[in-house]
């Protein structure tokens, strides 16, 4: 009987350890969203805004100590969608495909002629319902409305990556 109990315990232990899970970092998944999936893209952009909220605007910056508009767009597209974009607003304004304002979709780049900065351009990422995410000179990383008179007047173009 003692041998039988030992056999049962050994067999049960084998099953328990054989079925237990382990985490191997080699197989860990780091999901990056797809810019073409609107719901996922909105969630990814929301996460990025949450992480970068409070980051001040700093011309030429690309870190949480300070970031400018094109740096934030470049960082967001790489961090969230694994896409590499050019660094400057001028280069980003020539990247991808031109899209009519009426056809704007989540993840499109929206450009403005503000007359500020080294080239007078500003860029953000369209989210939904006329809202876009950007690094603002006044509020840092924020959502703004395209319907705001300032942004509406300064609107220039939309590009799809």
From Swiss-Prot:
Q: Where in the cell is it found?
A: Cell membrane
Q: Which keywords fit this entry according to its UniProt record?
A: Cell membrane, Hydrolase, Lipoprotein, Membrane, Palmitate, Protease, Signal, Thiol protease
User: EC number(s) in its UniProt entry?
Assistant: 3.4.-.-
NlpC/P60 domain ranges (all copies): 39-161
Q: What is its main location?
A: membrane
Task: Give me the Gene Ontology terms describing cellular component.
Answer: plasma membrane
**Topology with regard to the membrane?**
Lipid-anchor
Residues with a covalently attached lipid (N-palmitoyl cysteine): 19
Q: What class of enzyme is it?
A: hydrolase
What Pfam families does the record point to? NLPC_P60
Q: Which InterPro entries match?
A: Murein_DD/LD_carboxypeptidase (IPR052062), NLP_P60_dom (IPR000064), Papain-like_cys_pep_sf (IPR038765)
Q: Which catalytic residues are annotated?
A: 69, 122, 134
Q: Write down the superkingdom of origin.
A: Bacteria
Q: Where is the signal peptide?
A: 1-18
Please give the sites of covalent lipid attachment annotated as S-diacylglycerol cysteine: 19
Query: GO molecular function: any one?
Result: endopeptidase activity
Q: Name one GO biological process term.
A: peptidoglycan turnover
Spell out the family assignment given in the record's similarity comment.
Belongs to the peptidase C40 family.
Indicate what this protein is called per its UniProt record: Probable endopeptidase HI_1314
Q: Which organism is the protein's source?
A: Haemophilus influenzae (strain ATCC 51907 / DSM 11121 / KW20 / Rd)
